[in-house]
C-alpha cells in the first residue's frame, strides 16, 4: 500500500509557453552555448563586480573561464581578461584600484597577474613552477600571499644502470610511499607539499613562509597590521591517516615563525580577520568520527583565546565567512531545503537571512551551491540561479535583489523548458518528510502521465534543489518526467537528518526514494509501468542498490558507482577518509559490515537491464567498481553495456561533447528497454 501524508506541487519555473511562443526544446548542441557566472567579487566601495564567466567553446570542447567586470549602477559589463587560456580567482586590492587574478594566458603553469584598473594594464608578477591558489592582498596593498605546491623528490629504491648516450629506454620505475597517492582530476600526485608564499604586488622575488613535510592550505588572510598571515594546516604526527584534523596557524611574515591558534580534534579552516584586527572568524567542527558533520562558524581573539561557536544553535552547515564592515557580524552562506542562502550572523549568535536563491557552478544536475561577496556598505554580489537559468550575477541591497546579467537569453529565451515542481511526501520507512522536485516534459498538461526517470544525487551528503540542470532538461525534452529527490542523509535539512545514514548507507534511503516515486505516481505525473532509474557517484551506489531490491524499473543507468565497499576503500583516492569515517573499521576487521553495504551483495537479485558508465580516469569511484557490476550482470545473463568516458575523472562532464553523448546513450538504453526485459526460459 502506498502511504502519503500530503503532496504539494509548487511551480518554480516559468509556465509553459503559449501557443505562439517558442516551441523549440533544449537539445544536446545547446551544451556548447551555455554560460554560467561564478566567484562574484564586489569591489570594496560596491561600484563594480569582477566575476568568472564560464562559457562553452565548441571548437575546444571545453568550458572556458574568463574574467568580466560589471558596473553595479548601470549593469554594463566588459571582458577584463578573456583571451586564450583559463582566467580565474579575481581578488580586489584593499583600495579597489587593482585586481589580482590567476591565469594560464602564457601557457604552462598558471601564474599570478595584477591588473591596474585605471590604466587597463595587466602584469604577470610571478614565474612559478606550479600553480598558485588562495591569493590574498596584504592590508596595505603592497604584497600578495598565496599557496603553492613545492615539488619534492620522489622516493627511490635502487637504480637502473647508466643509459648509453642516444639509447631509448623505458620510463624509470615509479615508486610510491604516500598513503594518498592519487587524487581525482589529478592522477598520481606529484611529490611535494603546499606552502605559503608572499610576493610584492608589483612583482619581485617570492618569499616562502612555511616549511616541513606538511600541506598548508587556504583560504588565507592577513592580520590588520600586516605582520601575520593566517592559514590552516594538518601538522599532526599521523596527518596522512587523520585527514580531518587541521588547525589555524599564524605565520609571522618577518621571521616565518608558525604559531597554532586552535588545538582541538577536528578540521579548523578559513580564518577571516575582523576589520579592526581584534578577532578571527573561522570554520570547523569537533570530529565526532562521523562521515559528515555540519561545519560551524566560530570566532576567537587574534591570539587564539576566547574561542566560541557563533552558529552552535543554528542547525545548518555554513561556509564562506566574510566580516561586515562594522565588525559586529559575519556573513556566511548555507543551504536550506536544497536552496543556497546568505545569512548575517551576529556576535551574539543571532542568524538573519539576507539573500536566497543562489545558483552554483554545476550545470548537469540540480545541486545547490553559489558564491557571494560583500562590499563595505553591505551590498552583496551573488550568483543567482533558478530552475530555468544557470547562475547569473546579481546585487542585493537592503533585501532587494537585482540581476545584472542575462548570460543565456540568446539561447534559452527561445526554448520551451521543462517546468520544475516541488513534491513533498513521507517515507514509508518512518514517515519522515522527504522533499523532491519534478521536471516535467515541455508542454505537459495536468493529468497527463509520462515515463519517469528517478535521478539520484551523489555525495551522499549533498542536496538537490530547484536549480537548472542540463541532464534533466534533456531527459524532459525526450518526453520523460525527472524526479530529483533529497533522501535521508541529504544536507540542508539538519544534522539529525544527515546522521540517519551514518554507517547505514545504503539502507533506508531506498524507502525514501521509492516513496517519492510513489508520490509522483499519485500526483498523476508518472506512469507506474514506465519507470527508469539513474544516478552518479552516491547516486550510482543507490541506483545499483535499488535494482538489487526491486524489479519495478524497466531499465537503469548506473553512473560512476561503488559496487564493492572493500575494493572501494582500498583503491579510491580518499582511502583514509572512507575507512575511518564511513566504517570505523578496516575491511579485514569487519568484512561483514562492508559486504552488507555493498550493492554487489544484491547482484544475484538483479533482473533490470543496466547500462554502466564511468570515467576512464576516475580516482574517486575507480573504473574497477563499474567493471565489477558490468561483469556480474553478464555472468547473470542480464542485459548490460559498459561505457568508459576517455580522459574523464569523477566529474564525468568536463567535456560538453562527452556529456551530450552520455545523456544520449542513457536515453537510447531506456528506449531499448522501454517495455522491460524478461529472462529467457531455461
Residue ranges and their predicted role:
Residues 55-59, 105-108, 151-154, 236-239, ...:
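Short glycine/acidic-enriched loop and turn motifs that connect beta-strands
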Residues 484-682:
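Active-site-proximal cap/loop segments of hydrolase catalytic domains
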Residues 236-237, 288, 407-529, 536, ...:
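Cap/lid segment of the alpha/beta-hydrolase catalytic domain
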Residues 18-37, 59-63, 69-88, 103, ...:
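Multi-bladed beta-propeller domains
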Residues 49, 96-100, 141-145, 229, ...:
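Hydrophobic beta-strand positions that form the internal "hydrophobic ladder"
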Amino acid at each position: 500500500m502506498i502511504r502519503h501524508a500530503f503532496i504539494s506541487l509548487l511551480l518554480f519555473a516559468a509556465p509553459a509557453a503559449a501557443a505562439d511562443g517558442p516551441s523549440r526544446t533544449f537539445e544536446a548542441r545547446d551544451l556548447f552555448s551555455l554560460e554560467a557566472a561564478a566567484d562574484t567579487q564586489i569591489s570594496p566601495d560596491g561600484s563594480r563586480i569582477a566575476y568568472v564567466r564560464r562559457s562553452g567553446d565548441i571548437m575546444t570542447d571545453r568550458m572556458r573561464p574568463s574574467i568580466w567586470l560589471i558596473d553595479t549602477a548601470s549593469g554594463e559589463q566588459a571582458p577584463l581578461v578573456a583571451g586564450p587560456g583559463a582566467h580565474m580567482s579575481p581578488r580586489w586590492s584593499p583600495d579597489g584600484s587593482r585586481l589580482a587574478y590567476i591565469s594560464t594566458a602564457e601557457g604552462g603553469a598558471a601564474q599570478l597577474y595584477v591588473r591596474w584598473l585605471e590604466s587597463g594594464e595587466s602584469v604577470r608578477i610571478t614565474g612559478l613552477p606550479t600553480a598558485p591558489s588562495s591569493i590574498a592582498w596584504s592590508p596595505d596593498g603592497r604584497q600578495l600571499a598565496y599557496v603553492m605546491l613545492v615539488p619534492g623528490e620522489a622516493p627511490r629504491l635502487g637504480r637502473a644502470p647508466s643509459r648509453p648516450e642516444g639509447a631509448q629506454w623505458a620510463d624509470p620505475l615509479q615508486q610510491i610511499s604516500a598513503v594518498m597517492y592519487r587524487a581525482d582530476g589529478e592522477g598520481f600526485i606529484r611529490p611535494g607539499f603546499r606552502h605559503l608564499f608572499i610576493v610584492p604586488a608589483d612583482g619581485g622575488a617570492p618569499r616562502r613562509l612555511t616549511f616541513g613535510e606538511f600541506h598548508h592550505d587556504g583560504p588565507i588572510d592577513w592580520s590588520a597590521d600586516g605582520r601575520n598571515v593566517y592559514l590552516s594546516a594538518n601538522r599532526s604526527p599521523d596527518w596522512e591517516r587523520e585527514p580531518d584534523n587541521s588547525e589555524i596557524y599564524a605565520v609571522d611574515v618577518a621571521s616565518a615563525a608558525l604559531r597554532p591558534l586552535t588545538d582541538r580534534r577536528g578540521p579548523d579552516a578559513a580564518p577571516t580577520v575582523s576589520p579592526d584586527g581584534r578577532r578571527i572568524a573561522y570554520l570547523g567542527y569537533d570530529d565526532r568520527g562521523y562521515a559528515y558533520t555540519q561545519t560551524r562558524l566560530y570566532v576567537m581573539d587574534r591570539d587564539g583565546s576566547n574561542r566560541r561557536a557563533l552558529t552552535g544553535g543554528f542547525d545548518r552547515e555554513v561556509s564562506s565567512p566574510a566580516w561586515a564592515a562594522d565588525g559586529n557580524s559575519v556573513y556566511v552562506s548555507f543551504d536550506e531545503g536544497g536552496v543556497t542562502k546568505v545569512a548575517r550572523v551576529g556576535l551574539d549568535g543571532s542568524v538573519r537571512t539576507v539573500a536566497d536563491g543562489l545558483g552554483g557552478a554545476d550545470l548537469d544536475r540540480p545541486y545547490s551551491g553559489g558564491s557571494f561577496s560583500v562590499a563595505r556598505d553591505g551590498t552583496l554580489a551573488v550568483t543567482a540561479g533558478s530552475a530555468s537559468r544557470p547562475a547569473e550575477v546579481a546585487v542585493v541591497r537592503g533585501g532587494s535583489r537585482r540581476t545584472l546579467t542575462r548570460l543565456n537569453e540568446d539561447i534559452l529565451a527561445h526554448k520551451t523548458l521543462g517546468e520544475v515542481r516541488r513534491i513533498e511526501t513521507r517515507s514509508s520507512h518512518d514517515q519522515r518528510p522527504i522533499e523532491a522536485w519534478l521536471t516535467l516534459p515541455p508542454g505537459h498538461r495536468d493529468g497527463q502521465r509520462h515515463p519517469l526517470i528517478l535521478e539520484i544525487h551523489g555525495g551522499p551528503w549533498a542536496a538537490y534543489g530547484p536549480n537548472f540542470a542540463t541532464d534533466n532538461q534533456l531527459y524532459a525534452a525526450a518526453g520523460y518526467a525527472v524526479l530529483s529527490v533529497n533522501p535521508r542523509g541529504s544536507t540542508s535539512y539538519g544534522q539529525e537528518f544527515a546522521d540517519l545514514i551514518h554507517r547505514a548507507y545504503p539502507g533506508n534511503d531506498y524507502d525514501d526514494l521509492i516513496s517519492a516515486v510513489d508520490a509522483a505516481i499519485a500526483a498523476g505525473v508518472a506512469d507506474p509501468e514506465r519507470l527508469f532509474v539513474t544516478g552518479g557517484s552516491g547516486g550510482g551506489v543507490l541506483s545499483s542498490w535499488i535494482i538489487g531490491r526491486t524489479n519495478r524499473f524497466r531499465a537503469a543507468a548506473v553512473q560512476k558507482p561503488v559496487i564493492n565497499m572493500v575494493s572501494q576503500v582500498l583503491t579510491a583516492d580518499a582511502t583514509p577518509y572512507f575507512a575511518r569515517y564511513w566504517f570505523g573499521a578496516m575491511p579485514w576487521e569487519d568484512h561483514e559490515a562492508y559486504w552488507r553495504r555493498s550493492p554487489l551483495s544484491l547482484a544475484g537479485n538483479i533482473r533490470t537491464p543496466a547500462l554502466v558508465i564511468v570515467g576512464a580516469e576516475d580516482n574517486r569511484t575507480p573504473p574497477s567498481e563499474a567493471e565489477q557490476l558490468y561483469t556480474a550482470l553478464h555472468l547473470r545473463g542480464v542485459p548490460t553495456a559498459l561505457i568508459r568516458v576517455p580522459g574523464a575523472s569523477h566529474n564525468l562532464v568536463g567535456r560538453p561533447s562527452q556529456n551530450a553523448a552520455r545523456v544520449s546513450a542513457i536515453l537510447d538504453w531506456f528506449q531499448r528497454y522501454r517495455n522491460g526485459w524478461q529472462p529467457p526460459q531455461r
